[in-house]
Each structure stands twice: as C-alpha cells, then as structure tokens.
Amino acid sequence: MSQAFPAPAKLNLFLHVVGRRDDGYHLLQSVFRLIDRADTVHLELRDDGRIVREGALPGVSEDQDLTVRAARLLQPYARPGAGVGIRLDKRLPMGGGLGGGSSDAATVLLALNRLWEVDLPRQRLQALALRLGADVPVFVFGQTAFAEGVGELLQPIGAPVAWYVVLTPPVHVPTAAIFAAPELTRNTPALKIAPFSAGMGHNDLEPVVVGRYPEVGRHLQWLGQFGEARMTGSGACVFASFATEDAARSVLQALPDTMQGFVARGLDKHPLYDFVPE
C-alpha cells in the first residue's frame, strides 16, 4: 500500500555569495526557512529490491531523478530485497528557487530511513543528502537554518512567526547559469550569526536574474508595494513576509490576473523531522 509524505518548499530569507572555492563552487551565507507549501511523495514498499519511478517528470530521466537517486543511495544500508515504488505529486514549480527537487529527494531519504528501518542518525543522513546536491541537506536538517560553506554547514536559528506571499513568475531560471554569470558579485562581507531579523541581508543573485528575466523584476516591483520583496534562491519565485495570515491573504487577493502566487506559513520544523533518531 502506498504512503504519502510531504516535501515542503524552502525560502532563502537572504542569500549572500561571499566567495568561490578553487573547484568553482560558490561559498554562501543564507537563512533557509521551510514553508507549508509542499510536493507530495508517494512511496510503496517492494520486496524485490527494485526502485521504480511511477510516472515521469518532463525532461528528467530516471537516472537524473533525485528521488530515485536518493533511494538508491540509501538502499545499501537497508535489508536485502528492500525496494520501493516512487510517485510524485508536484505542486512546487521547477526552476523556481523553492527547492522542490531537493526537498523531494530529502523526503525520500527521511521516509525510507524509517520505512526500511535503516535508522541512520541525522548527520549521516545529511552527509548522504549532500551527495545529491547542496540544497538537499537543509531539508534533512529540518529546521530554520543559518547556512554557510556551499550550503551544507547548518546551524539552527530562531525566526519569528511569519506568513509569506510567494509569487511564481512564468519563467524557468537555470541555477548554474546564474552562478556562472560574469556580472555576479562574489565578495559580500560575511555575516556573523546573530538573532535573525526580517530585513537582514539581501539576495546577491537577484540583480543578475532581474537583468536577464524582466518578469522577475515586474513581480518584485508589484509585491514591493506591500512589503520588502525578495527573490528566493536563484529565482524565479519572489516573496514578502507578513505577521498575520489575514495580511498576507489581503495582498494575494489584490494580485493582478497576469500573475500567480500563493500564501504559505513558515515552519519551525520539517513535518518528518521526528523520523530520524538524534
């Protein structure tokens, strides 16, 4: 029987590029906040040792699919014959900066860690997650996090109760191209971790994306009438924070017909946080 598990989106409340390693990876500082908008990952255990993707994502082969790769990565730690069928219900846009693919992969790791009775501790599961991509460990970490390094050095950080209006411009932003852009500044001074405030920092990738994708700038400008609007990740999604659900929903109701978006609540912990032994 299939079981359903949420894969929540993330927002980068700020994202600073503070340097670049010799291997080309960028050194970052960011605060990651999970929100209650989510994909759903359906898992059905098998005893034939096979990992089967049910339904294809457009343009994503099975070998590239992060959910399949996550299951394959954990499988050697499981009992012989452990397998799984994987099906995704996508609500999060691809190429939107909400971490949907990374979150889907993390949910597979978190859920199968329990369902396959692997019971790896969180730090070991995060190390596996990093092999799938720089954004995957934060979803396994499962809390609002101050991130450094390439995004894998994580510390828990308190964040206020917040509701977010998230707008989804109709463009797909390729992350690698934005990080490779010659106009990207890579020398933002590093911050010391401190009590987080909503106006802290900025997103170094935002000017690059706005310069290449004017639709993102148009959405930022509209949302900026109501609060401090920012881009998450490498875009294209943009967001603003509000103290109450009513305030956020009143902004969403004013959204022009030419734009799309949603309201989401900030989460303090991942819904599957307790699936991992400490």
From Swiss-Prot:
Pathway: Isoprenoid biosynthesis; isopentenyl diphosphate biosynthesis via DXP pathway; isopentenyl diphosphate from 1-deoxy-D-xylulose 5-phosphate: step 3/6
Keywords on record: ATP-binding, Isoprene biosynthesis, Kinase, Nucleotide-binding, Transferase
Active site annotation, chain numbering: K10, D135
Residue numbers binding ATP: P93, M94, G95, G96, G97, L98, G99, G100, G101, S102, S103
SUPFAM superfamilies according to UniProt: GHMP Kinase, C-terminal domain, Ribosomal protein S5 domain 2-like
Signal peptide: none
Biological process (GO), any one: isopentenyl diphosphate biosynthetic process, methylerythritol 4-phosphate pathway
Record EC number: 2.7.1.148
Its job: Catalyzes the phosphorylation of the position 2 hydroxy group of 4-diphosphocytidyl-2C-methyl-D-erythritol.
Family matches, as HAMAP family: IspE (MF_00061)
NCBIfam families per the UniProt record, alphabetical: ispE
Record-given protein name: 4-diphosphocytidyl-2-C-methyl-D-erythritol kinase
Gene name tied to this protein: ispE
